[in-house]
């Protein structure tokens, strides 16, 4: 089999946020904050398979918030070095980092030295009041996003703002243009626009997603804007399209659903390693398992 992407699962379902569209995040407690043991033998198998597929990027991701497990991130980075992936990314909301820089200073230095190249920051907008409603509804305010960007850049990381596009948050051309301008002003290297997944994977999110997903018309307007205002750079099959919009790298991403599945074993989308040693090619379909 051959794959386009390699994802490595960090931590547990524990997350300090309670995003209504979330796949599986739950409130941290004594049990889910305990690190799980990693099957390093099977990570090597997954890494070798990723190398055979010609994958150039490994994404450290989570069912919850990975930065709640900083030591595990460090260990993963050390074990992944032997596979020599050019790009090593961490997907996070980065809120724990923004709220406790003193704690994460040493980890960020370690991660950079151990090969982490890119941190992707999950948001729903560039506007703090909108992000607060989704990510920090029980707090007085959202984190200072421009300050976080500047802070992470100071360690040498490349950054990507990944926006989950929802109704009344990121649903118009004007909002998208404002978001792109925000990224450019703050020297963010990459932007990803990802419409919230129509095929909800958590029953509790079903009603919210139905009410807050973008319409087909809204998606088309955003796509046409990017094509008119920008230059198409890359077409990544079943992943998305990358544009240059006034000097800003912007990816219009395709959500994981039946339309991004290919039954050709030489054209699988995602190779996924779980800490218990299971290696899968589907996030939600239990039958999509290799080991």
Where are these regions (language model features)?
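Short Fe-S-cluster ligation motifs
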Residues: 42-63
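Radical SAM enzyme [4Fe-4S]-AdoMet core and its adjacent flexible, acidic
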Residues: 31-34, 129-134, 138-143, 150-262
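Radical SAM enzyme core and accessory elements
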Residues: 1, 262-291
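Canonical Radical SAM [4Fe-4S] cluster-binding loop centered on the CxxxCxxC motif
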Residues: 1-42, 53
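Short loop/turn motifs at secondary-structure junctions
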Residues: 18, 54, 84, 115-116, ...
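Acidic (Asp/Glu)-rich catalytic clusters
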Residues: 48-52, 82, 108-115, 149-156, ...
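Canonical radical SAM enzyme core domain
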Residues: 29-45, 66-118, 123-130, 137-144, ...
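Hydrophobic faces of well-ordered beta-strands that scaffold small-molecule active sites
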Residues: 5-8, 58-60, 88-90, 119-121, ...
């Amino acid at each position: 089999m051959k794959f386009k992407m390699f994802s490595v699962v960090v931590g547990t379902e524990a997350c300090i946020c309670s995003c209504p569209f979330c796949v599986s995040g739950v409130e941290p407690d004594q049990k889910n904050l305990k690190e799980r043991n990693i099957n390093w033998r099977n990570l090597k198998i997954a890494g070798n398979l990723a190398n055979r597929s010609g994958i150039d990027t490994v994404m450290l991701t989570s069912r919850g918030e990975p930065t709640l497990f900083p030591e595990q991130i460090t260990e993963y980075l050390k074990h992944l070095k032997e596979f020599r992936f050019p790009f090593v990314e961490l997907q996070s909301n980065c809120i724990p980092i923004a709220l406790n820089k003193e704690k994460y200073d040493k980890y960020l230095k370690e991660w950079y030295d151990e090969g982490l190249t890119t941190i992707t920051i999950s948001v729903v907008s560039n506007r703090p009041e909108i992000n607060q409603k989704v990510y920090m509804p029980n707090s007085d305010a959202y984190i200072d996003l421009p300050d976080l960007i500047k802070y992470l850049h100071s360690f040498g990381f490349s950054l990507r703002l990944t926006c989950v596009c929802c109704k009344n948050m990121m649903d118009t051309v004007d909002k998208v243009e404002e978001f792109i301008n925000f990224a450019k002003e703050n020297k963010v290297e990459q932007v990803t626009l990802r419409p919230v997944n129509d095929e909800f994977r958590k029953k509790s999110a079903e009603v919210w997603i139905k009410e807050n997903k973008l319409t087909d018309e809204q998606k088309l307007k955003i796509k046409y804007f990017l094509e008119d205002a920008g230059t198409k750079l890359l077409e990544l099959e079943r992943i998305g399209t990358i544009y240059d919009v006034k000097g800003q790298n912007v990816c219009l991403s395709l959500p994981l659903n039946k339309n991004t599945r290919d039954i050709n074993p030489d054209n699988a989308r995602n190779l996924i390693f779980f800490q218990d040693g299971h290696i899968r090619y589907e996030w939600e379909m239990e039958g999509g398992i290799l080991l």
